[in-house]
């Protein structure tokens, strides 16, 4: 027997064909959400408050300080928040201290700071009763970046940018004359030496001393001449910069100093964030630039004064490693700026002189920023000078330019950081308000409560959750789509890219995506490559860079250890990483002398002893959905992409089955998705039924798990959980208590395992269509339950309150038979389109009645005249069984919108069997539409009499190159015959030897094909056919949701043409090309009525309707409304536009509202006309009958 048994949870054993020993379990798959939010509560929120506060008033006599905060218990439970359309949020109380600096008085007070949405254990937020997800954002990291560009003459120029988290950008660039310029915040450029002089290094000699002698520096100094001898060079530079930043304002050196300080050196205006400081220190550190260069002078330790490295030494990796411990103390130089500088502190730089790589006769000066501490959140003069040095060194062939798509330069902003940014925005708005209140009010009686207005903060948070591009309605089709949505990474959103500006490079797969972002799972269409998914082992470090785990290789012994090292993309660039599929012996050493490995994007063979790390698992490359595709390695990447995306659209079935051929990922995906119920602690089941399970812990306390039955999911499917445990079962923490939707025995089960044959049948599976046996309909194999929610609310109107009632005017008793005494539908009633769900009447304005009418009205109380029917009815195309009714009223203490007195929600469940027009798919991107459902007796059958369930077109395989489906087919049949389940993990699954040996073990023929007999004739087909078991899923694109027909419906206001689309109950567009077709046929009458009555001839269509109901000839059509619109449009351009008839007489086009009243039938009149026509018709029919009897 090939393969080995593996246990998944307590309910499933699979035969696995994997060969690689997994040394690291998958992390919790939603930790990117939960960890980030927890981090925000523990540190992020506090940090934001400390950034903005303390705040002083304008006279600096009062100061408001932040002390701490506390989150109290949420107001609603999860279930209550869902039911009441409320937020699942907790009140937050912040303690402030108000200090009076004159009297020394301190007032401390706890202030209510609004309700803060809380993340559920599943990684979601409940906002207005609906589950939402905050998608993590992929953005360019703050830091310093260098680039090169080739101009039209083929000359290479260089550029550099310092990008902060917030604040002004500082750019450097060269021009065609080899002069270096700088730009501050995208303004006009100035020679870079001008900025150096403004920083207090004004002499040419000083500049040469700092940067060394190079052509770029010389050319720039020549350009930057001293124009005004009355000013010092620094003052002149400051004025020049001020003129660029604030053109037209009077320039003084003092105002320029304060402007530059505010722009770059004030922590409130400029923030690099810890990640920006880390990236700048890493880039401007000298180690990388000095590697393999030759020293031109001795290197001295600043503290001891000893010579550490002599001139002429080549700085190899080994040499640098020897001096690593003292490297930061070597060659430190302090420069003192002059008295007119922006900042007066001394500037500490690390300065080496090396032999120029391009010309051994010259010496190049290399400057580092001497590693400022991590808490220095602004840019420093040392950073600016070191950036300029790196920029000048690039022209000398030192250093290297950055690749912006490298994942070392892109980071993730997860939920916590996105929320912190929102709170910061709110607090900054609040701070302006605070200053004014502190200055205006009396200091003696001031308390924190009086001066703090929390509105800006709560508004910022509300806006973020309600309308940000990154706050999304959770995709809840099935557990996999939930999980994928939580792990999604979007490059769009505020501060990110836009679809139109993103080019091919940003969207493309980059070598650093390996193990960090899935190269396969991304949408097709305009967002391709901009929306990605985290790889299965991906994990964020404290700076937001994605790390991936590797096994460390002991270079001394050549042993692959089980020690796990997590590396970011730029750390990985320094190493050679071997593949996880490289064979190892029993001592964990490589079997082969040469192994396949990766280094900086090159996939090549390396000597085994040169590898530093090894992948932990073959599936670390791909995301969760992709890792659920068996034989992924045999599929073309485009089809694998479709397969991964379509699994997320699977509809939960009534009785789903886990795949015979899985990948072993199904258990983990179901466990972490949040859709199942997982035991929180060890214990024993003391009560279990369909609604709740109680587990007694060892310490005696009781855990109660509530099980959801047929709840409506965000996608309108049934969210139904099934209890898995029995009374008396012992459960351990992490065990399944209940399966969620699309799960079976603790594994994800998106579809079913039908018997599939690759064969044509009467042409019905042309173009990927699917032929299906009636068994799948009768036995409810692909039946799903869908829940739709309808609501009706009563409001107060000017004419009186609306009312929910059974007494509805002009409605027969038959239509009310399923309503209760209040006028609300009974639970369990079957309803069809047009049926009343909630009877509701609205008062309507009375025409002035005569005295007699008023008297009669008062005596008999004729209600029908004063109210109109506004009942909630089942919309077009919907039907089903009423599953639940919820009633919310103010009397019960429910929170309703203002003006609403009562809200009724009706849930209708619909059981949908599979039918012609529904979309089906396999896991390999093989999708198709059901074209015919054939009676079981007519389907082809196997020699043992088993009829086939599905027939697919064999022509769908070769051109699409997704051969994985054929391998799955054969292995699936073997698994069915053997009565086992199989796991074939991606890139480490069943080989063809395993496949054929399992086929042989199952007693199948050696070619895995079989003879099929035609169900209609009993004759065998000419050729042997591939028949097997393939996992097939029913997708969310169902024909019931798409089919649509319109008779009478709404029109667009301006053009008076029917609206478009099913949601608007619109018509089918008869476009330009369709008009050409009718013209080609010469069908002039058909054409005329399509362009007039059936479109936008307003009076014509009403008269036509009237003529049809009265049985009169249809009158001539009038002028289409769109023609009037065109006339008006031309008139609005100032053109004198008239319409002439054939005798050149002007035709007057009356506007609709000017037309004669006879021409226009109002809607009310139309209803009356319909009723009258119906009555007339009934009378005529009765008369005919009477005549017949006579």
Swiss-Prot record:
Domain of life of the organism encoding this protein: Bacteria
One BP annotation, GO: DNA-templated transcription
InterPro entries noted in UniProt: DNA-dir_RNA_pol_bsu_external_1, DNA-dir_RNA_pol_su2, DNA-dir_RNAP_su2_dom, DNA-dir_RNAP_su2_hyb_sf, RNA_pol_bsu_bac, RNA_pol_bsu_CS, RNA_pol_bsu_protrusion, RNA_pol_Rpb2_2
Alphabetical UniProt keywords: DNA-directed RNA polymerase, Nucleotidyltransferase, Transcription, Transferase
Entry EC number(s): 2.7.7.6
Top enzyme category: transferase
Recorded GO CC terms: DNA-directed RNA polymerase complex
Reaction it catalyzes: RNA(n) + a ribonucleoside 5'-triphosphate = RNA(n+1) + diphosphate
Positions in coiled-coil regions: none
CDD domains for this protein: RNA_pol_B_RPB2
GO MF term list: DNA binding; DNA-directed RNA polymerase activity; ribonucleoside binding
Subunit structure: The RNAP catalytic core consists of 2 alpha, 1 beta, 1 beta' and 1 omega subunit. When a sigma factor is associated with the core the holoenzyme is formed, which can initiate transcription.
Database matches in HAMAP family: RNApol_bact_RpoB (MF_01321)
Similarity section: Belongs to the RNA polymerase beta chain family.
PANTHER family per the UniProt record, alphabetical: DNA-DIRECTED RNA POLYMERASE I SUBUNIT 2
Function in brief: DNA-dependent RNA polymerase catalyzes the transcription of DNA into RNA using the four ribonucleoside triphosphates as substrates.
Protein name per its UniProtKB record: DNA-directed RNA polymerase subunit beta
Organism for this UniProt entry: Streptococcus suis (strain 05ZYH33)
Source species taxonomy: Bacteria, Bacillati, Bacillota, Bacilli, Lactobacillales
Gene name for this UniProt entry: rpoB
